[in-house]
């Protein structure tokens, strides 16, 4: 069987100009990056704003195994299948981060016959957006340190600087560093650290900004630290939002590529869902809604993380809310949530499927709390058995949720037709009545408790002393009406990655609260969530190479 990269390299790509012609996009509307990649101009984005708004389909998943459950693959395959049954459809997904590509994932542009192309470019440097975000972030760090060196007119307390440097790699050695060493000519010594680029607030801002002016406004609002008198210091105080926006002036424009089947796709922005809000850009999603009758998008990790943030943080910034949510489930993930060890997930175990169904059931219930109909997609694997599939279908019927098998990895668009038809039927017969989980006017504690008790089903929230102090500071500064972005393990409803399935009566501890005023939310950190990942014992990078003719090897 061919690998993902071999399948991708066997496809004859169409020029991107031809792919997007059916959407009413012309050559003059594009800023080309070679023949197969382009950015859409702001003139065209503004021109389509008066178009009708299409249907929005959000793809999410149950709590995943470390290998992931094929959510991006299902998103791409579903869009291809919708086009196959005659629905004018676009995709709006995130750009992969190079860190996980070189680490555990080895690629994140779909898989099999449900991929966005050119996958090598998308997984590596693409159109340079990640570089621009990294540069803007680190330019701000350099400007902060220069301000300290040049006399510190703003009275910034170097012990209370929140802003970190970033790099788009998994590099645990950079989590804690000291900068400014080497004497008076080299700056003011202070403790610093690096996050991965996709954890930068600038990434979140890029994904929520609606235009250049909104981008500048959000950049100006970033809190970079505190003065000696404990008052906040912003980018606006440094007067450098214009310079940062200049670095990002092209990165804010959505990127256009294609699937194996020629479906147009926006691939733009890529914040993680366990440490950020986990959704592609508002600009890309909104523009897709104005260009197509159906837009298929995704939110990172399980529905407890990505989907909750999509619905509570991103949706209020969109012209519409999701008309349906597709929850991707795999039998291997259900079995893992049912107590099966990782090395036994390919063995038939009907009882483990029954036990693990509690996890899927909770995600379905949670989506319904937002007033949106859910559809379950079983992402098929060769190890799945007829008995396991039959039990899962029976269990889905018991909670009255539509369920379809999807084999888009192996069969492409054809393998998603049944799912596409079910989603279209669900949207037609069950109109969504979207409502947010909480009102922003609730206190910080109440909003967190709402997420923990209603989505995670925990019994109590504990706030460490540091978090309590930060809440008081947030209230004092008038930031307490912002939504909450939970930073939590993706493997469990709880903050314990080993508590699989559908745990109950657990307590969640909030250890820190970080205001992200530019993004417009407050991050609540739980457990041991890292904003700079490390590499595994055997990184995917060990399998990667490039041949003398430029052929890429090892991206899978």
Swiss-Prot record:
ATP binds at residues 65-72. Its EC number is 6.3.4.3. Pathway: One-carbon metabolism; tetrahydrofolate interconversion. GO terms for molecular function: ATP binding; formate-tetrahydrofolate ligase activity. It catalyses: (6S)-5,6,7,8-tetrahydrofolate + formate + ATP = (6R)-10-formyltetrahydrofolate + ADP + phosphate. GO terms for biological process: tetrahydrofolate interconversion. It comes from the Bacteria. It comes from Streptococcus pneumoniae (strain CGSP14). This is Formate--tetrahydrofolate ligase. InterPro entries: Formate_THF_ligase, Formate_THF_ligase_CS, P-loop_NTPase. Gene3D superfamilies: Domain 2, N(10)-formyltetrahydrofolate synthetase, Formyltetrahydrofolate synthetase, domain 3, P-loop containing nucleotide triphosphate hydrolases. The gene is fhs. Keywords: ATP-binding, Ligase, Nucleotide-binding, One-carbon metabolism. HAMAP family: FTHFS (MF_01543). Belongs to the formate--tetrahydrofolate ligase family.
């Amino acid at each position: 069987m061919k690998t993902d990269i071999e399948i991708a390299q066997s496809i004859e790509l169409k020029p991107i100009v031809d792919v997007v012609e059916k959407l009413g996009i012309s050559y003059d509307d594009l800023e080309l990056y070679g023949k197969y990649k382009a950015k859409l101009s702001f003139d065209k984005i503004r021109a389509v704003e008066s178009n009708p708004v299409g249907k929005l389909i959000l793809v999410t998943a149950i709590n995943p195994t470390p290998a992931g459950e094929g959510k991006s693959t299902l998103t791409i395959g579903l869009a291809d299948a919708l086009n196959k049954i005659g629905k004018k459809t676009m995709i709006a997904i995130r750009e992969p981060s190079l860190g996980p590509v070189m680490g555990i994932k080895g690629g994140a542009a779909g898989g099999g016959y449900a991929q966005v192309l050119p996958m090598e470019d998308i997984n590596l440097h693409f159109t340079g957006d990640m570089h621009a975000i990294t540069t803007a972030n680190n330019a701000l760090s350099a400007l902060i340190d220069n301000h300290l060196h040049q006399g510190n007119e703003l009275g910034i307390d170097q012990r209370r600087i929140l802003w970190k440097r970033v790099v788009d790699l998994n590099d645990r050695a950079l989590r804690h560093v000291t900068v400014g060493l080497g004497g008076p000519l080299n700056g003011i010594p202070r403790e610093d650290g690096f996050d991965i680029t996709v954890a930068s607030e600038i990434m979140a801002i890029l994904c929520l900004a609606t235009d250049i002016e909104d981008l500048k406004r959000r950049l100006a609002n970033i809190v970079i630290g505190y003065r000696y008198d404990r008052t906040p210091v912003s980018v606006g105080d440094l007067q450098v939002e214009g310079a940062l926006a200049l670095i990002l002036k092209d990165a804010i424009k959505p990127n256009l590529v294609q699937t194996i089947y020629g479906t147009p796709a926006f691939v733009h922005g890529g914040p993680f869902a366990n440490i950020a809000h986990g959704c592609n850009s508002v600009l890309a999603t909104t523009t897709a809604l104005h260009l197509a009758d159906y837009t298929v998008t995704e939110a990172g990790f399980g529905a407890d993380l990505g989907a909750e943030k999509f619905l509570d943080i991103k949706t209020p910034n969109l012209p519409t809310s999701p008309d349906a949510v597709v929850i991707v489930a795999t039998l291997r993930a259900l079995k893992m949530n049912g107590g099966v060890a990782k090395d036994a997930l390919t063995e038939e175990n009907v009882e483990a499927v029954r036990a693990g169904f509690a996890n899927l059931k909770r995600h379905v219930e949670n989506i319904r709390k937002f007033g949106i109909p859910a559809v379950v997609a079983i992402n098929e694997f060769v190890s799945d058995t007829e008995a396991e599939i039959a039990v899962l279908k029976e269990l889905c019927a018991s909670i009255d949720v539509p369920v379809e098998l999807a084999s888009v990895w192996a069969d492409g668009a054809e393998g998603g037709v049944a799912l596409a038809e079910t989603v279209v039927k669900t949207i037609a017969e069950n109109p969504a009545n979207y409502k947010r989980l909480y009102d922003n006017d609730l206190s910080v504690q109440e909003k967190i408790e709402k997420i923990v008790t209603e989505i995670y089903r925990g019994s109590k929230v504990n706030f460490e002393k540091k978090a309590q102090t930060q809440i008081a500071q947030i209230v004092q500064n008038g930031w307490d009406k912002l939504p909450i972005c939970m930073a939590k393990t993706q493997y469990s409803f709880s903050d314990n990655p080993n508590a699989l399935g559908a745990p109950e009566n657990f307590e969640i501890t909030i250890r820190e609260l970080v205001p992200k005023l530019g993004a417009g939310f407050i991050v609540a950190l739980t457990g041991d969530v890292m904003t700079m990942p490390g590499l595994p014992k055997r990184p995917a990078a060990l399998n990667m190479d490039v041949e003398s003719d430029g052929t890429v090897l090892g991206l899978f």
